[in-house]
Amino acid sequence: MDLVRLTSLLPPSVMGGPTSPRPLWSNQGLPFRFQSKNRFSPVAAARASHAASPAELYWKIALPTSPMPGAIRDLINPARSASQEDTDMDEVSTDAVFFLEKDLFPGSKITLHFTRGGACAMVLLRGRADAIPFASEKLPEILTQLSVPAGSRAAEDMRTTLAECEAALLGARDQAKHCVTSLESMVEFAAASLGTRDIRAVSTEVIGTGAAETPRQEYTVEAVKPVVSVSGGNMVTCHGMPYAYAVFGCHTTTATAYAVTLAGADGTRAEALATCHGDAFPGVAEAYERVGVAAGSVPVCHIMPLGDMLWVRN
C-alpha cells in the first residue's frame, strides 16, 4: 500500500495533532548540507512529537508482526542522522573483515570496526521519492533540485550510484536485483522476491550507542544462531548506496545468515549479522585470498555493516 494513501486514511489525531497531517519531510524541497567529503545529512529535523511518523505507521500496517530494525529506525529519524559524526564514505565502504564459517562459534575472537554503509541520509516517502528524477541523464536537474553542488564529490558519488543502478551491477545474473528509493519500494521488492508479505528485516546493531561507528577492537563471540531455520532458501540483502537520500541496492541471495552476539574489549556490545557465501560471490574474490582458500571451496563470511539490511521470511 502506498504510504501517502495509507496516511490519508488515518484520523488527524493519529498523526500527532488536530490539524491536517503533514509528512515529516516537506514536499517543497529537500535542503541538504554537505557534511564531510562525500556524505549528506538533512539540515531540518522532524518536529518534536511522540506520535508515530508516517513511515512508522506504514511499517506497522504493512508488517504488523515484524519489529522495525535499527537500520530503518535510523533512516526515519532525521534528528539522529543530522547529529551523527562525519564519516568518510571511502572508509565505511571498504572496512570489511572476512573469515571462514567454521571459525564462527562462541568463544572465538574477531577484530571489527563497525561502520555505517552507504545510506546515511533519511528515507523518503514514496510520493516524494517518485517526484524526483532518478536517471543519469537527469543528474543536473537532480543536483539542482536537491541543492547539491555540481562537480562536488557528493555529485560524483550520486553519478556513480545512478550508473550502477542503471547497469544492474548489483549481484550476479541469476539474482533478482533492484535499486529502491523509498521504504515502500524496499518492502514491496523484498515481498515479491520472497513470494510472501510475511517477512521481516534484520540488521547489525551496536547496543547502547548512537555513534556512527565504533573503534576497531577485538570482539568475543558470545552466541551464534541461524537467522532462518531452513538453509538454502532465498533472502534479500539491501546495501546502502551513497546518495542525497536513502537509496539501497537490493538483491536476492542464497547465503547463510547468522545472528551473532558480540562483546567488545571496551564493553561495547553488538548484535551483528554475518552472511556466509558458499560460492565465488561477485565483487569480493579478494575475500578468498584474505582467508587463504580457493574461491568457492568453503563458505566465507563477513559481518554486514551498520545500515545494511537482510530480509527473510517469517
Swiss-Prot record:
PANTHER family: BURP DOMAIN PROTEIN USPL1-LIKE, BURP DOMAIN-CONTAINING PROTEIN 7
Organism superkingdom: Eukaryota
Keywords: Signal
Signal peptide: 1-16
Domain BURP: 98-314
Tissue specificity comment: Expressed in shoot and panicles.
Protein name: BURP domain-containing protein 8
InterPro entries documented for this protein: BURP (IPR044816), BURP_dom (IPR004873)
